[in-house]
C-alpha cells in the first residue's frame, strides 16, 4: 500500500491542465476533451462565438434573446418537457451571454454524457422559434433587467442614475451604450438571421471535462460533425474612447445613509508583451497596497479592493473602498499620497516578489474539479493552440519587476477618474433638515398666534 501511495504521488500522475485532446471536426467545430479526476461526472461547455459586443446599441441584447429562445422547447412539450428530459438524465444546465460569446453550461453524470449531448445538440439545431416563444423570451429578459423598460427608466439611464461607477465612466468616455437596447422592438427575422449566421459549426467550441466515454470522439463526429458551417461573419470594431470625462464626480446611490463607496479608475495601458499577466500582477500589488493603506494603517475602509473590467477596446482598473461619509476626504488624501509614492518610487521589490510567488502558487489549486477546469478552458480559449493551453504559472514567472514598473508608470501617468457613490442624504443632513423644518413650523405657528391674539378691553367700557 505504501508503494502504491508513493507511485500515485509522483508528478507524472498529476493532472496537467495545459495539455488537452483538441481537434477540429470536418465542419470546423473545435473540440477540446480532458479526462478529469472525477470519473463519474462530466462538465460540458458549448461556446458560440457571438456576444453582446457583436451588435450595436440598438440590437445589443439580440444574442441574449436568442439564448433564452433556445430553451423554449424542441417539441410540443415545450420548455417544461425539455427540462424534464434533462432531469431524467440527472443533469443541470444554464446559459450565459457575455460581451464576447454565448456559452451553454451543463453538469451531468458521466454515464449519460452522450444522451445529454444529444439534448444539447437538439436545442441548438431543432428548437422551433415562433412569435409566441419570442414574446415569452422578451418578457423574461425584461424581468431580468428589472421590469418594463419605459420612458422613465430610459431617462434615468441617460442621466447615469443607478449605474455602477465603472459603467458610468465607460458611458461618459463613449465605451458603453448610454441606454440598453429595447428588446420589445426586436423581430423574429432578426433572431433567425442571427441563428443562421452565427450559430454555425465553425463558430463553436465544445469542451468536455471529466470521465470521458471512450467512444466520445466517434460520437461527436457522427452528431455534432453534421452541424452546418457557414462563412464566418466579420466581427464589428469595438468602441474606442471618443469623449472626455470629468476627473471627479459624485454619484447618487439611494436616498438615505452614511455609507459611501469610493472608486478611483484608471484606463489600462496597452503593453508590448505578457499584457494580461503583467497587469494581473500589478492589480494584485495595488490590491495589497490599498488594503495596507486604507485598512491596516488608517482604518478607513473594511474591504478595499481592486477590480479589472473591459469596455469596448479598453481595459479599466478600479481601486475601490467602502467608507463612512465623513472619511471621504481623508481617504482621497491617503490614496493620492499612495499614487504619488508609486509614481516616484515604483513597486517595492520584496512586496512584488511575494505577491508574484503567491499568484504563481495559486495556479496550482485554483482549478479544482471538472467544472472549474472546464470554466478555465472556456476563459482561456484565446491562449489555446494545437492541443495545449498556455501555462499561466510560467507566464506569471516571466513577468519582471522592470516590466511591472513600466506598466505602473503608464497606468498612473494621468490622474485617473474619481467616482464617489453616496446616498442623497446622510443622517446628519437629515437631522439638520428635520430640525430646520420643525423650527420653521414653530416660527410660522408663533407668527400666526401673534397675529390672532385677542385684544384687551378698553377702560371706557368698565361699569361704575
Regions found by a protein language model. Name each.
Residues 200, 205-260, 266-270, 442-447, ...:
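An aromatic/glycine/proline-enriched structural segment found at the starts
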Residues 75, 82-194, 242, 351-374:
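Acidic/histidine-enriched segments that form metal/cofactor-coordinating
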Residues 263-265, 283-323:
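A structural supersecondary motif
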Residues 9-11:
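N-terminal signal peptide c-region/cleavage motif recognized by signal peptidases
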Residues 205-210, 344-346, 350-464:
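C-terminal regions of mature proteins
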Residues 45-106, 173, 288-300, 460-463:
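M16/MPP (pitrilysin/insulinase) zinc-metallopeptidase core fold and M16-derived inactive scaffolds
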Residues 28, 46, 64, 86, ...:
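Buried hydrophobic packing residues in well-ordered domains
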Residues 16-21, 159-204, 380-408:
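Histidine-acidic residue clusters that define the catalytic metal-binding segment
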Amino acid at each position: 500500500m505504501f508503494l502504491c501511495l508513493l507511485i500515485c504521488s509522483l508528478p507524472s500522475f498529476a493532472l496537467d491542465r495545459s495539455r488537452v485532446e483538441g481537434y477540429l471536426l470536418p465542419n470546423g467545430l473545435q473540440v477540446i476533451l480532458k479526462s478529469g479526476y472525477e470519473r463519474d461526472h462530466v462538465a460540458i461547455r458549448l461556446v458560440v462565438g457571438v456576444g453582446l459586443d457583436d451588435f450595436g446599441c440598438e440590437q445589443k441584447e439580440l444574442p441574449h434573446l436568442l439564448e433564452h429562445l433556445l430553451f423554449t422547447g424542441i417539441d410540443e412539450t415545450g420548455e417544461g418537457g425539455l427540462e424534464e428530459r434533462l432531469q431524467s438524465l440527472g443533469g443541470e444546465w444554464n446559459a450565459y451571454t457575455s460581451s464576447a460569446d454565448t456559452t451553454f453550461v451543463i453538469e451531468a453524470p458521466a454515464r449519460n454524457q452522450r444522451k445529454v449531448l444529444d439534448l444539447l445538440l437538439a436545442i441548438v439545431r431543432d428548437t422551433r422559434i415562433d412569435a409566441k416563444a419570442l414574446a415569452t423570451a422578451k418578457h423574461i429578459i425584461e424581468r431580468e433587467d428589472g421590469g418594463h423598460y419605459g420612458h422613465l427608466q430610459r431617462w434615468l439611464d441617460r442621466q447615469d442614475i443607478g449605474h455602477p461607477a465603472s459603467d458610468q465612466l465607460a458611458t461618459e468616455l463613449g465605451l458603453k451604450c448610454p441606454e440598453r437596447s429595447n428588446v420589445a422592438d426586436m423581430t423574429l427575422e432578426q433572431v433567425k438571421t442571427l441563428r443562421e449566421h452565427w450559430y454555425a459549426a465553425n463558430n463553436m467550441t465544445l469542451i468536455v471535462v471529466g470521465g470521458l466515454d471512450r467512444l466520445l470522439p466517434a460520437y461527436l463526429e457522427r452528431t455534432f460533425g453534421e452541424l452546418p458551417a457557414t462563412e464566418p461573419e466579420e466581427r464589428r470594431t469595438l468602441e474606442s474612447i471618443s469623449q472626455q470625462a470629468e476627473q471627479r464626480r459624485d454619484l447618487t446611490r439611494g436616498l438615505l445613509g452614511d455609507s459611501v463607496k469610493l472608486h478611483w479608475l484608471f484606463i489600462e495601458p496597452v503593453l508590448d508583451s505578457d499584457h494580461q499577466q503583467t497587469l494581473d500582477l500589478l492589480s494584485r500589488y495595488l490590491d495589497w497596497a490599498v488594503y495596507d493603506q486604507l485598512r491596516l494603517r488608517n482604518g478607513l475602509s473594511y474591504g478595499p479592493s481592486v477590480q479589472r473590467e473591459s469596455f469596448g477596446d479598453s481595459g479599466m482598473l478600479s481601486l475601490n473602498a467602502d467608507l463612512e461619509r465623513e472619511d471621504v476626504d481623508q481617504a482621497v488624501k491617503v490614496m493620492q499620497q499612495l499614487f504619488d509614492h508609486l509614481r516616484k518610487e515604483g513597486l517595492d521589490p520584496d512586496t512584488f516578489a511575494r505577491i508574484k510567488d503567491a499568484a504563481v502558487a495559486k495556479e496550482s489549486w485554483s482549478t479544482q474539479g471538472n467544472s472549474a477546469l472546464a470554466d478555465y478552458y472556456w476563459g482561456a480559449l484565446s491562449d489555446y493552440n494545437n492541443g495545449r493551453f498556455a501555462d499561466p504559472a510560467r507566464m506569471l514567472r516571466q513577468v519582471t519587476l522592470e516590466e511591472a514598473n513600466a506598466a505602473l508608470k503608464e497606468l498612473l501617468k494621468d490622474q485617473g477618474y474619481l467616482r464617489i457613490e453616496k446616498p442623497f442624504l446622510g443622517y446628519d443632513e437629515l437631522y439638520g433638515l428635520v430640525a430646520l423644518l420643525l423650527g420653521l413650523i414653530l416660527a410660522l405657528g408663533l407668527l400666526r398666534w401673534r397675529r390672532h391674539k385677542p385684544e384687551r378691553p378698553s377702560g371706557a367700557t368698565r361699569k361704575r
